[in-house]
Regions:
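Acidic/His- and Gly-rich active-site-bordering loop/insert found
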Residues: 21-124, 133-154
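Short, Lys/Arg-enriched N-terminal segments with co-localized hydrophobic residues
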Residues: 1-19
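Divalent metal-dependent hydrolysis catalytic cores, especially in the metallo-beta-lactamase
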Residues: 152-162
């Protein structure tokens, strides 16, 4: 049957299943929060600018590998672009993460106003350390939920430098 504009989509889950899924998702995130925060702080400390994020990439890849993801580095001939994959088949779910620092944005961590630590040094003033690890958190949560429900599908998580 062809769908018509304004027609309600098919419901994939009953409401109770959805609520249980949300609760399970938060539980999975909570279990990994310390590890995710540590990775974010470590990436903050590296503050590597575009296409030089070797240490930051290793931090993220190590967590992905420990969680059972297959990791492929050097995507599109960019040495610090990488992908973590879990599962196979369809649908393919993609999540994008960034993790580069910006030149001249060095500042003290946790401050509510800019406090320069090293004048002119690179830093994560735009929060890409958190964007990268938030994507990591979403990937792990998705993997854990999918595994419990035995859902098929491929989860491709892309982290792009620069």
């Amino acid at each position: 049957m062809k769908k018509q504009c304004g027609q309600q989509p098919e419901i994939m889950y009953r409401k109770g299943d959805m609520e249980m899924g949300k609760q399970t998702a938060w539980e999975e995130i909570d279990k990994k929060s310390s590890e995710i925060f540590t990775a974010s702080d470590e990436i903050w400390g590296c503050a590597e600018t575009a296409f030089t994020e070797d240490k930051s990439m290793k931090i993220l890849c190590d967590v992905l590998k420990a969680e059972g993801f297959t990791v492929e580095t050097g995507l599109a001939d960019v040495k610090t672009a990488f992908k973590g994959t879990f599962g196979s088949g369809k649908p393919v779910i993609g999540i994008l993460g960034e993790f580069d620092a910006l030149s001249g944005l060095d500042q003290e961590a946790g401050a509510t106003e800019k406090i320069v630590v090293h004048d002119g040094a690179s830093g994560h003033g735009c929060g890409h350390n958190m964007l990268g690890t938030a994507s990591l958190s979403a990937a792990i949560r998705n993997q854990k939920i999918s595994g419990r429900k035995r859902k098929t599908g491929n989860r491709d998580l892309f982290w792009l430098p620069g």
